[in-house]
Each structure stands twice: as C-alpha cells, then as structure tokens.
C-alpha cells in the first residue's frame, strides 16, 4: 500500500480536478481512500456516484481500464455524462445560464429562483442542475418529499465561473471519455453487474443506509437491504470498499456494519470539524472506510494496527 504525508495529500487533492463543490464529496479524502485500492484493476463501479470524486481521482492515476457511474439522482448523472462525453456542450450551456444572472432584472438571487422553478417544472438540463448546485448553500442538493429541488441560493457568491468549469471538465473528460458508462438505477441493479476483477466503491447517501429518507434522493436506503447486498458481493468474490459511518470527537454517528460481513473498518482523519471550531472546540472528524476480504490482505502489514479501528492521518 502506498502512503502519503499530510503535505502530499493536500497537494494531490489540489491537483485533482472537480466539476463543482458537492456536500458529502470524498474529494479531500480521495488520496487516503486510494491508498487502500489496488494499483491496477479492470473496472471501478460507483453505485452512489454523486459528483464522482473517487472515479476522477482513480482515472487521473489511470488505475482502472473502465468506469461505471450510477446515481439515482438522474440530473446529477446528466452533469457527469456531459462533462465527460461532451464537455463543449456543457461549458457552452452553463456559460449561458451563469452569465444570465449577471444581467438579470432583480439580481442573481432572483435569477436562481427562476432557474429553480424551470428545473422543477421539467427543464432538468445538465446546465440548469449544475448552476443550481454551484449557487446553492454548501453545494447541498435537497429535494422535497415530492421530488422538488428546494435548496436556497448562497447569496455571498455567484458559483463556479465558466472559466474554472472549462479548465476542470476538459481535464476530467480527457481521463474518462470513451471509458465510462452512466446510469440512474437502484444500486442493487448496479451491484449485480459487478464481476471479479472489478472494484466497487460505495458511498451511500448520509445515513440513508439507516432506514431513513435522505432528502438528496427520491427514496431512502434500507439498512437490511444494504447489508444483504454487501453480503451478496462477498459471496461472489467481488472487491469493494464502503464509506459509511464515522465519529466526531467522542460522538459516533451512524451504525456499524455487522461484524459477520468480515469487513475491516478503517477510520480516516477528515480534519477538524468546522461546527466544533465555531463552538470553540477542536474536535477531529473521522470517516469510516470498510474493506472487503481481498483488499484487507493487500494492505501493507505496518498499517494493520487494529482489525476494527485504525486511524489514518
């Protein structure tokens, strides 16, 4: 297993392009997560792709031959498909929407609500979805119980500029164009497609894996169903990694995956909690990464400090 210093990790993170800020993105943790992956494998499958931070990081290092991106949130997949396959189209259409806010009567905030209304009325183009994501608070996608995008705009900024977007998506396209499939299916359908030689990376939405509805998505994910799907991967000999629960200070959030799955749990240092800093406490957030059987055996022995809990800084 390759290891990196904290300074190297920061440098790697800065050099990996991203499309737009996205709450829950594993971009900052990608260098740590990739340390537990094989140097080469056939296909990377992301059933909960979001903005595909792990796929982008893996493709930059040319570790996989093919990539499969899936997310139940179809408009997000529309962004990824255009960014990778037709970046010229995405940049041109996004530029139109983004520049319109600068001259819109009533200002950029009013413009945001106009685009949001159009999106909810059916114009779920990649450019509209990307603009809403770039402008909304914390880059946090939120839907109502009826599937309406209901996040508010961040009034302090205009969102990712077309120039910055172009620089990043052309890089991303150069890594992934012609090597990637896109879908918006139930994650279990995607897992059925995995074969030995593939690596599945799963980052289920928040604690939607804990029987609760996650309002980034149109449906929640049942814990027992998820555990059953993971067990099925085990029985088929598929390599996989899961970003799942974690802790901040003394507080643990999320439910541990069952021990009978035979997974190794690693705690990755995600840095100081911004919320705790605001409250005058300096508490470190750790995010859990679960490794399947063969990935555990590939890990360098010096890193096997504990079977269930291991801090990686």
Label each PLM-derived region with a short phrase.
Residues 2-32, 87-201, 205-213:
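SAM-dependent nucleic-acid methyltransferase catalytic core
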Residues 56-58, 79-81, 193-194, 210-214, ...:
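A short acidic (Asp/Glu
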Residues 35, 40-117:
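SAM cofactor-binding core of SAM-dependent methyltransferases
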Residues 51-54, 73-75, 135-138, 187-190, ...:
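Short, solvent-exposed loop/turn segments at secondary-structure junctions
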Residues 220-313:
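Long, positively charged, glycine-interspersed low-complexity recognition regions
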Residues 47-48, 70, 183-185, 202-204, ...:
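Short His-Asn-centered micro-motif
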Residues 213-221:
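Short, surface-exposed loop/helix-turn segments at secondary-structure junctions
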């Amino acid at each position: 297993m390759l290891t990196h210093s904290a300074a190297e990790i920061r440098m790697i993170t800065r050099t990996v392009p991203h499309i737009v800020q996205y709450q829950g993105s594993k971009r900052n943790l990608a260098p740590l997560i990739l340390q537990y992956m094989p140097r080469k494998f056939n296909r990377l499958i992301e059933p909960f792709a979001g903005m595909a931070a792990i796929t982008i990081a893996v493709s930059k290092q040319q570790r996989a031959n093919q990539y499969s991106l899936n997310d139940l949130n179809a408009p997000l997949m529309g962004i990824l498909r255009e960014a990778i396959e037709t970046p010229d189209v995405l940049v041109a259409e996004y530029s139109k929407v983004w520049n319109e806010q600068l001259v819109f009567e009533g200002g950029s905030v009013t413009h945001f609500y106009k685009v949001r209304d159009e999106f909810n009325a059916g114009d779920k183009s990649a450019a509209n979805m990307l603009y809403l994501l770039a402008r909304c608070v914390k880059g946090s996608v939120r839907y109502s119980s009826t599937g309406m995008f209901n996040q508010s705009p961040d009034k302090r900024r205009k969102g990712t500029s077309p120039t910055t977007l172009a620089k990043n998506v052309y890089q991303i396209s150069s890594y992934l164009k012609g090597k990637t499939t896109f879908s918006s299916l139930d994650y279990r359908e995607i897992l059925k497609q995995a074969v030995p030689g593939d690596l599945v990376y799963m980052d289920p939405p928040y604690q939607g894996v804990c029987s609760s509805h996650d309002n980034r998505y149109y449906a929640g994910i049942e814990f027992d169903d998820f555990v059953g799907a993971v067990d099925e991967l085990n029985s088929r000999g598929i390599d996989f990694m899961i970003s799942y629960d974690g802790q901040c200070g003394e507080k643990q959030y999320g439910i541990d995956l069952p021990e009978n799955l035979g997974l190794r749990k690693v705690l990755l240092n995600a840095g100081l909690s911004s919320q705790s800093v605001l409250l005058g406490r300096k508490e470190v957030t750790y995010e859990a990464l679960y490794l399947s059987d063969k990935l555990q055996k590939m890990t360098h022995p010096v890193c096997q400090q504990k079977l269930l809990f291991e801090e990686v800084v």
